[in-house]
Amino acid sequence: TKDSTRIYVYLEKKNSNTFDGFVGFSNNETKKITLNGYLDLKLENILVSGETLSLYWKTDGNDQKTFKASIELPYLFKTPIGLKTQIQVFRQDTTFQNTKTAIDLSYFANYNTRFYLGYQGTESSDIQNLNSNLISDFNNSFITTSFDFTKPETNNLTFPIKSKLFASIGIGKRKINTLSEKSEKNQFLLNIQATHTFYLNKKNSIYINSQNNYLKSNHYITNELFRFGGFNSVRGFAENSLQAYFVSLLLTEYRYIISPNLYLHTILDYSLFKNEIENTAITKNLTGIGIGMGLQTKNGLLRLAIANGHAKKQQFEIYNTIIHISYNVKF
């Protein structure tokens, strides 16, 4: 008819899968060849059901090895209910190995907001069978509840997320077996992470990332503590080189956009954490200062950061400077 209108919509698939990693070989102290590197892979909607599959592997060839895998299946049976499972293995040289498993039921309030109710447990093995007061075999289990909110930044490939909030609490128990103690203790777990980008104008912005973890227990052992430090934590320190039962991180960047594909930024990271030594809580402060850049290429985002980490009242030393490199490819 004269008044009829036809609308044609052509949908083009958007790349949402990401890959980041490298593999290298080096000689250790015994002149043997060791494998080092990392792999960070995230696949989304490959089965056209909205699922997310993540794989992470990292080794420094000597002290630490980490493996993580998770899968999330949303909208089961066409309902807002989903399922998420994950496994994480962390090995510290010949000292201990932790294996953590978790399963969560999720409720999708909307595309950006999710609620979780789940269970997680960790089994830790004292590889050298020392069973001391510092490192020991243990098992823990927690009932957890979580909240996840993400606000995307549309039409921005370099900074696709404007705001993100994740909060999780867990209540559970830990069983340990040492030479001096065989007991079961109640524990409380708290994890809060929040990020936000404040846009001053088209070229200037401030990025803030707050990461907070707390484990409440009557007694702590080394192989259950949180580990932090590195590119996605307080920069200027080696990956997972720090440990604590309480840690609060504030990571900040002032960003200046030179062109649509290139930006420079400052680095100012602050860390407050607590450890327990001989039943006495010790509080420490760390600072990471540096500069960085990001380059949006055809295939992904290349990031380079140079940061120097030092403790409070510690003199600045140039040899503490660490270079962090990341290339996140989308396909």
Regions found by a protein language model. Name each.
Residues F77-T79, Y111, N139-F142, N223-G236:
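Surface-exposed loop/turn segments flanking beta-strands in extracellular/periplasmic regions
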Residues S16-T18, I81-Y220, F273-E276:
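Transmembrane beta-strand segments of outer-membrane beta-barrel domains in Gram-negative
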Residues K14-S16, I46-V48, L76-K78, F108-N112, ...:
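Outer-membrane beta-barrel channels and translocator barrels
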Residues E44, P74, A102-D104, Q120, ...:
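Subset of outer-membrane beta-barrel
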Residues T1-I81, T150-F159, A244-S248, Y256-I258, ...:
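Outer-membrane beta-barrel initiation region
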Residues T1, W57-T59, I87-R91, H310:
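Conserved short loop/turn motifs at secondary-structure junctions
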Residues N36-D40, S54-Y56, K68-S70, K164-F331:
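C-terminal transmembrane beta-barrel domains of outer membrane proteins
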